[in-house]
Amino acid sequence: MNNYGVSSIGTSLTPSPTGSIDEYTSKEVKHPEDVKVDASYEKEEVGYGELEVVPERGNLFQRWYRSFLPPEDGKPQKLKRTLTARHIQMIGIGGAIGTGVWVGSKNTLREGGAASVLICYSLVGSMVLMTVYSLGELAVAFPINGSFHTYGTRFIHPSWGFTLGWNYLASFLATYPLELITASICLQFWININSGIWITVFIALLCFVNMFGVRGYGEVEFFVSSLKVMAMVGFIICGIVIDCGGVRTDHRGYIGATIFRKNAFIHGFHGFCSVFSTAAFSYAGTEYIGIAASETKNPAKAFPKAVKQVFIRVSLFYILALFVVSLLISGRDERLTTLSATAASPFILALMDAKIRGLPHVLNAVILISVLTAANGITYTGSRTLHSMAEQGHAPKWFKYVDREGRPLLAMAFVLCFGALGYICESAQSDTVFDWLLSISNLATLFVWLSINVSYIIYRLAFKKQGKSYDEVGYHSPFGIYGACYGAFIIILVFITEFYVSIFPIGASPDAGAFFQSYLCFPVVVIVFIAHALITRQKFRKLSEIDLDTGFSKYDRLEESDKGPMTAKSLAKSVLSFCV
């Protein structure tokens, strides 16, 4: 017998936990001479004539190093399904509550006024809700890698999936360094240090977090999103107390709706259109749960609960928080224009005006964490988008590589490298550079939402055309095709209002450069789509030819009926789960 427990007569000896020689047992092996033995592995029989190579535990560094290697069996590794329902819910919340509401609200208040903000955010919120319901049904029916751009390839046109995927990825690559710069600006609220130093620290931190795979991303999002929700609820309560004159340090006393009435509409219809388009971009990130579908345990159970709860909460948080802040801060407040990005946040200004010690610092810390988690979300969604595009042949094939822990390493590294663009902030021309970088992708979220709704409509029509049973789908959007049509209609209105505001910007004369910085993405997407379609010569598929079988997750409703009738206890539990 050799040193590794494999004898020359066709047996493998497995030591007992005690290590006693008398307790060694012999197991028959079919072809031991074909077994390649390595000193770093122990051998374990899993069936007649089969050997499974199991890595020794080793020390922490050895296990960490081996996790980056390809799978031992040589087969391509797939993304791991380790996310749960609680992760999916918080990813949806975390993707939506970010700089769009904390910092971006200063622009909407200044350009449109309080009433415009409430109306536009409510209207856009209803559109996002319909879109996410459609995405939820698609994700349950087809929990495949790539989500909406994969749906675009299958249900709309392969060239559209190619165009949408690259445009969406470009938006991540352009926004990622901006999030790092914004985070460094948040720190200037306390200490003025070169931004390049902080950007280096943030990139290292994001690399560390993403080394823990999708489960690490899910846990970080769960913790941070919970913190953001508590901060949002805390501000709403605190803001109501300030408005009612309940803060001793605030000598303004009762404020009521005085500020709101004086600044309900600013710049009239022009301002309303500006807020309408800005509100749409503030909700960006709500579609992140679609990307996570391929890494979620039991999507049929996780997604219905997520789409029913998360986005109603997000809409309420947005609307209530913006209503409260509009009661306290005027859209004509000069500080919204003169102060730096985070210092000019109306949420921080509201607390500073009330002279509440400490709270502005707490809220600035929450904004800092929100910005960093936004960058973390970009790393996750950007890498998964690039990986799925490589699987479809829309990106270089080496981005398909997934290590033993289910991490798309090369795709992650590619996205993280773009954080180095954040060092451009030290240049005098940094604003111009980033404006043009964003110009080719700033409408990407609108294209994604439109694609989700159109894909859903075509999917439902194809399902009916091919005579398939709709009961096999695990989750049904409560608004169906009508909700998707409504969502698509509102998105088209946002495109129109953005076009109008780009031509006639508020407080400035029409300018060709400013227009293309705002709307260049639209012609770029159209040109890329047409060019790719002409080169590949692929045509639109008929409803009867659309593939509804690959990746389809059939749902058995008999399992649901076995749960028994609804009782008072189960009803109360469902209501409590929805509200909490």
UniProtKB/Swiss-Prot annotation:
InterPro entries: AA-permease/SLC12A_dom (IPR004841), Amino_acid_permease_CS (IPR004840), APC_YAT (IPR050524)
Positions of region (Disordered): 1-30
Entry keyword set: Amino-acid transport, Membrane, Transmembrane, Transmembrane helix, Transport
Gene3D superfamilies linked to this entry: Amino acid/polyamine transporter I
Protein origin, superkingdom: Eukaryota
Biological-process GO terms, alphabetical: amino acid transmembrane transport
Ubl conjugation in keyword set: no
An example Gene Ontology CC term for this record: membrane
A molecular-function term among this protein's GO annotations: amino acid transmembrane transporter activity
Protein location: Membrane
Membrane topology, record value: Multi-pass membrane protein
Biased composition range(s): Polar residues: 1-19
Protein family membership: Belongs to the amino acid-polyamine-organocation (APC) superfamily.
Protein name: Sexual differentiation process putative amino-acid permease isp5
Source lineage: Eukaryota, Fungi, Dikarya, Ascomycota, Taphrinomycotina
Gene: isp5
